[in-house]
A protein has these predicted regions:
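Contiguous, well-folded functional domains in the mature portion of proteins
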Residues: 1-222
């Protein structure tokens, strides 16, 4: 009887310790790591492309893809989203999706090659999901990759991705200043981006020429 009591006590202690360890792991591994300077997020374990899309590998060998936090924030309001159709064979750099606001449209390239297996129908019905949760609920598509081992080497992850994003934010501020210098109408407050003004929704205030320039500078296929 004493032996059974001792065994039960040990099992109880082990169970409590396991629960504590899991709680610590959850606290130590948040779903997204914040970029301190500009309030943009990068999830741990996601690969980021230079065209501001991301790749998350699944346990089944497929790849979930979407738009990063920087792009969705600076674009601002989105009226509609169109995604490459099911079973579409995409090469890296082909158009994965288009986003539109009024008469302005941006084409966002696929970060990897493969076949479109699933499209996020909820996102198509509610484009605002891209703003609310770009890395989880706002995913764009699931792709069956074909050159994943090679193409992942061209993407950034973790600290490398964070450093690159900080440079992109700085480059975007310079881009907005250049737009002002060439005579593009600049909304009030936007010219103060170098002073730390919010970047959210900046592009929706600009005309089609600026959107086209943003496409060439920040969303070009690699």
């Amino acid at each position: 009887m004493v032996a059974l009591f001792v065994v039960a006590t040990i099992l109880l202690c082990v169970g409590i310790e396991l629960l504590r360890d899991r709680a610590k792991q959850r606290k130590a591994a948040p779903s997204a790591a914040q970029i301190p300077a500009d309030r943009f997020f990068l999830p741990k374990g996601f690969f980021i492309s230079k065209a501001h899309t991301w790749v998350e590998l699944t346990f089944s060998g497929e790849a979930r893809v979407g738009v990063d936090d920087f792009a969705q924030k600076v674009i601002g309001s989105i009226d509609r989203i169109e995604v490459a159709p099911l079973n579409k064979e995409l090469n890296k750099g082909d158009t994965l999706l288009t986003v539109a606001h009024d008469n302005r449209v941006l084409s966002i390239p696929a970060p990897i090659s493969g076949t479109v297996l699933t499209v996020n129908e909820s996102l198509l019905a509610s484009p605002q999901m891209l703003h609310q949760d770009p890395y989880v609920a706002g995913w764009v598509a699931v792709i069956v990759p074909k050159n994943i081992s090679t193409e992942l080497r061209l993407l950034a992850i973790a600290d490398d991705a964070a450093r690159w994003l900080r440079k992109e934010v700085s480059r975007f501020r310079d881009f907005i200043k250049e737009q002002a210098q060439i005579g593009v109408p600049v909304p009030a407050g936007v010219t103060m981006l170098d002073g730390g003004a919010p970047l959210s929704g900046v592009l929706e205030q600009f005309n089609e020429n600026t959107w086209n320039a943003f496409q060439k500078e920040f969303l070009k296929a690699e």
